[in-house]
């Protein structure tokens, strides 16, 4: 069943029926094991019961020290696929369920092993989306911050019990997280086929990677030949002729071995699982000139391989007994239902091998080595004094050290501060010194003198810890530490120099950018040059990120809310989308497939992405499957994201439409809500189904007949093509002013776009820029006005640029010195006063020009562009009536107009 390197053994710790579908394990301070059981996961190919509250967190205890768990309780039952079960104090767990936005604290108050109290711990830790893309696997790191996958922030429990939050870059992790002896957090990406991600620095400092993160072919797995080829990526992911996986597709469950009951050459090695390949990978971490590279410890082989098609390793953890515990869901289907759609390659494989009938099992395995027995000592940390906990910092097993530090920080017992300071200064064990240092930091008892001593230590690893720990003091306004950081960019060890640069950047120390650039330029060490250059270039760390008040790329002025929307959208893109669409929006290459094959379609320069907003909205809400114009992609399906909020959809859509060289209008939550309301669809679109529902601009404007209630002779200016020409009523805005379009033949219209201010073309481009080419506002729609010059009024939230300096904002009188407007009966040609959108509008349609129904749309206009969308309706005549009253001499103008239709 299993193939392991010589000397290694694997044996069950727990199996079904005591547990089912185990996906993760944690241990509390007394060594009791908590198992996350996703008992509802993929009970059939459609995942029809996945969200039923039948999952649990079970607790298991070895009461006599023989290595066998003999006491079992259900700590928390009736859960929806739990993702986090993290122990704090005795009987206290942090719990996060699937599709729950909030993390809770569960407490067993009477000691029976069953939680009987539930309290909110942190609101907003979770999300509602595809279950594979939700946070999980919490780590209390060396720095006393809590990290979990996906979320672009870290949490901390303050001494008063409050939960603090600090932003980080998105970590890229999918399932579980880990840390090494020096507090570097580790993550693995699954769906993006990457494996370990962001490996060059702790994620708190940024998402740093280099081209050679991995040795050649590191992402190629080596399963036992004779697989059943059940890969979501189809034949592109099948190694022929043996039917096994040819590239990572589902890496998960990361761990750094830090125990003491396996061979010493394993210490510090990285372990993660590939459940589609049925393997566990062991990787050597090699640091050269400050840069990390991962290498397969068993070239063209693996640490654990299995011949059993139901072997599904998803998580691996250090255990209190010094060994590694391996979680095996032991199930048929490992992908979520959205990737096993009817008619898909994977669905056919599931049906062929009846994988949908293989579930409700599970195993937890212990990996040992010949001649090295597991440590049978049972932890009893909950009953130990603070002084006894400090002694565990000398333990050779990292689990004991981490747990003791966590409990000391939670206790906030400062009676051990003198002992900790002595240990930090004098212990012969460097790891004990590091834990003592960080425990002092967690107790609020670290002082600058000790931090500086560490920064001057002969051991570069201790110098790095001194820098990192001192950041708490710098943030507390001890800015004298800036001089220490700056001095350390000249350290002889490149790893120390890199840490100094990271700290200077993250803490935004004055003069940091120039010093980092100078250091990177002057150094011949590759790591210093690479990381320093990435810091200065920006985009992968928070330190150099512009503030919301800064002017955007391309000279475009955005509102604060638009800039926030871009930042939220960027964060989500880096969390979820990049792994398939690529960090540059060009589509992530599908390794091993024919040249040019990507996991998902390119977003950069896409006419559909830059086209009408409904395309992006509908794809995000409902998903997209099948080929796109004859081209297939590795993921085969864009899963629906409609479980997210309207704001979430709008943020992501606005980001991709204004990044990677794209330039299109912003999308608002209201626009998403309107599409959501009209689109009731349970399955993803195909392109053939979707395109007929996307509005396209009528191209026969030369045949339109235009008229108006006031100044009708000028109405024809709108389609004349004469630069600067427009229609306006020749008087301030007042109810009853209307502008009418007669089409040459009836059309199924759904939208009217009115541009009131003439476009100003000052160039632009880049992220955040507004395109001026066809399709910027919608497929075939007229161009969106180019960016206003610096100093122009802030743009309205529709995403349209602001009017030029001196133009009136909507609903406001003209700027001082501006013309008051033309005399009644005049105007409408070139050179008139600045015009704005309608204060209010009402749209009616008719098929004969005589019979007019109730308004199909009503609302408030915007300047310079008013977009009016409504339920598709057959119309030959379209009348837009102005309904508001100007407070001054504000004139309604129409410079250009477009009418959009849908096929169905």
Provide a role label for each language-model segment.
Residues 316, 327, 364, 569-584, ...:
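The canonical Cys-X-X-Cys-His
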Residues 1-388, 399, 409:
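Beta-propeller domains with acidic blade repeats across secreted/periplasmic ectodomains
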Residues 387, 546-574, 586-592:
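Electrostatic cytochrome c docking/interface patches
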Residues 396-397, 428-429, 458-459, 492-493, ...:
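Short inter-helical turns and helix N-cap capping residues of alpha-solenoid HEAT/ARM repeat scaffolds
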Residues 376-379, 399-412, 431-445, 450-456, ...:
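Structural detector for internal amphipathic alpha-helices that build alpha-solenoid repeat scaffolds
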Residues 722-811, 816-855, 860-904:
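Aromatic, loop-rich ligand-recognition surfaces of beta-strand-rich domains
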Residues 544-564, 633-703, 765-782, 787-791, ...:
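Flexible coil segments in periplasmic/lumen-exposed cytochrome c-class electron-transfer proteins
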Residues 348, 426, 585-646:
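Gly/Gly-Pro-rich "capping" loops immediately C-terminal to redox-active cysteine motifs
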